[in-house]
């Protein structure tokens, strides 16, 4: 316990508040302290006790829970009886000499006589306090145990008159100070994160996939989430806990009390009431929300009214107002706005909250006379229960309740501020699901209208060409799928073999360097400042010598975190903060200490006068000013050197470049280098030598690249580009410009990159024509020179270095970083070299590729590269147009790279950590098969559907697609545009045999519709969407890795479902395509 630090300032302040109220009571609604002689509390050992007044008082005063501890507050002294270790901590409370502060006496437990001697001392102290009769206790607190029982017997024998002080102490602790408010804010932030990032998304996923999940399972998941860093806002998980078990209720059975328990019934997709609260440093918070799935207009109206009631209460929470008045005024508001709801309201609208989750004596109810004070924190909750929904189709949806709650802080001005500002309007909690049956009715009408327009205009023979083309595409798709199945079988086996060969390799733990300024006192400087006990900065040894208790103590500059200087009146202050365990560290600062158990200095502040006395050369503060300047200089120099050392520590030592004296060495002049060696861009020359390249800038800077360190070399011509370049992707980083680099590029510009818009131009201007001709000649000249250089290097190195040229015709747009660029495949890589930073993926290093967000209604998708080295971070390319999906698949398939696809974004960091933690277990559970489509017979179904040519209507599919992309067009204009596109010419008319056969098939199909009430939707365009369009998120085995999207789209689309065995299909918008539409809208 000696390592724990007491907040002495808070301890003094709070003890003085307790004694001030005791000596001169000011709380009008409770006078329990008025005639009290002494106060006693005991905290025993009981794991089942989560909240108690004794524990709350102890935490409020000391900041820590001390079990088996008796606290006695007498008129002029405070006594603590506890074990020896805890006494070491409590020694920090002694030697406080403030006026009006009681004396602190510490008693160590004596097990030889079972503390009878200590009990006698305490009872004597109680009897000597004032009259020694009336003892203030917490009547409802009951701790079992031998120690507690023995103390109770001693008290009973002494015949004190017990007075319950629970209410008055609770009211005393109710106004929070700044540190307490900060703790509650952090707890509220965690509550919101768990609710928004976990619970909300989990409920959405359950509804999306139509799964059956029990309420208690969801509750357990919330409790587990508080241990995960992504939900805890960077707070220490050891200081976090749930204030109560999360409550999830649905299906008609609702209890709007925080004593309710999540039952084992499955989640019902109707009204879902959720409540949860986190604790940080024992300070509680709460958030309650209600989700409405397909709510009726009446339900939406009731919910909107409930939100307005809560907003009205917030306006009434003003300091000086009685809580019963707040309740009555709220009741009057409800009677005025919606009198039918008065009987459905709860008995109270909230309660005070802090170290205890619920303070029963301070509630917003009809009988509470307590006055509101600034900085009180309340769990403000309002609800309406026992409501009926006559439009519900099932028994569970007939009865429902609405409930919302927040953690609020009473301020100086109205209204009170909400500390859990999670959105709660109907558009944020309403979930609107559109069934396929409703959608198909609309689609049937649309299809009939399009067919009618087609018959009037007639059909061209282009339809037969499209059908023939489609058959060929289906055959190609089947071959590709078959090849991918073969690759999938090989993937897991090769991965297991590779991991078995690699074995276990552990990273070396980095420890902060233990720097020693002087090995002996003889090395200490003998400067006058040192002798005069002034601050002295030793630049040579990078040490600051500071006077501490009259002794000069050296501190190496690496121990100093930061310094600050301020002038206040006649004094200058210099504050020096040190690194210590528990302090926040920078990204590049080592956080591990050689001796973490040692005693560390946190900060030191020096004060010196600015007043110059007679006879003095300068003011005393000149020493602090000079020290401040020198420390900054030495610190800057030290950090710069450390940064350079960090850059160098992972470097692999390279061989020495062997210069070739041959004058015929391949050489290119007037090249720029990326990244720049210095800030200013300079040209230079690149020359090939015996074992590597050397680049020399005009300033004389040298960069050497050895052949054996080149992983990939690229030559990109200037066709369609403004630069021509050579790019080297290295195996190991090299150092230049004081930084490490794995990608080095040499390039020159072709033509003018910028255009003078103010220049007068003419189509046939001779100067412009001459400039264009000159540019064409320059391009040809540069292309020839670079190509010749590459060929000479390949010949000289005997193909050790081979230059790849990107295939521009195979390129596709994507955003590997912030901006969209053109990604171009090479024979062994996927690259973008024009923009900086470059993007280079070596295909030999790729394990598999996964496509994310492959859905009908989205215009683009993401591509994830998983590397064979599983410890390496996955590479991501965002925003690839959906019409390039088949193109990318075909390229990957030709490179023998396994790919998979899904409708959602996955948490790849979590996936890769799971794999690296237990690779054997991962492959035993199927390995990468979790990314496969959910249906094994999907290919067979697709083939069967593709053979039913008479049921395929390309015009319908295309028009559906067009309507998704350009929804602002009218239906009539869509029909006309599509008809023009399909017919090819307005003059073509008449019907051929294929049209007549199609009409006959349509009549047969219509007959089937009448006989069977399950119409088959038109097929999608397989060329545009490929097999991805058949994937449904409902049964994906990768749900456990899904990352939770933060936003949900609120619009609906008319996309058709291609699945026959599902009554309802729900698709979920990705947060990156909020502008597009989906089958389900969420508000």
Swiss-Prot record:
Sequence ranges of Basic residues compositional bias: 1024-1033
Stretches with biased composition (Basic and acidic residues): 988-1023, 1058-1076
One GO CC annotation: nucleus
Keywords in alphabetical order: Chromosome, Coiled coil, DNA damage, DNA repair, DNA replication, Nucleus, Phosphoprotein, Transcription, Transcription regulation
Modified residues (Phosphoserine): 437
Region (Disordered): 923-1083
Taxonomic superkingdom: Eukaryota
SMART domains attached to this UniProt entry: FACT-Spt16_Nlob (SM01285), Rtt106 (SM01287), SPT16 (SM01286)
GO molecular function, one term: nucleosome binding
Coiled coil: 466-504
Cellular compartment(s): Nucleus; Chromosome
GO biological process: DNA repair; DNA replication; positive regulation of transcription elongation by RNA polymerase II; regulation of chromatin organization; transcription elongation by RNA polymerase II
Compositionally biased residues, Acidic residues: 935-987
The keyword Coiled coil is assigned to this record: yes
Annotated function: Component of the FACT complex, a general chromatin factor that acts to reorganize nucleosomes. The FACT complex is involved in multiple processes that require DNA as a template such as mRNA elongation, DNA replication and DNA repair. During transcription elongation the FACT complex acts as a histone chaperone that both destabilizes and restores nucleosomal structure.
PANTHER family associated with the record: CDC68 RELATED, FACT COMPLEX SUBUNIT SPT16
Family: Belongs to the peptidase M24 family. SPT16 subfamily.
Assembly information from the UniProt record: Component of the FACT complex, a stable heterodimer of dre4/spt16 and Ssrp. Interacts with TRL/GAGA.
Record protein name field: FACT complex subunit spt16
Species the sequence originates in: Drosophila melanogaster (Fruit fly)
Recorded name of the encoding gene: dre4
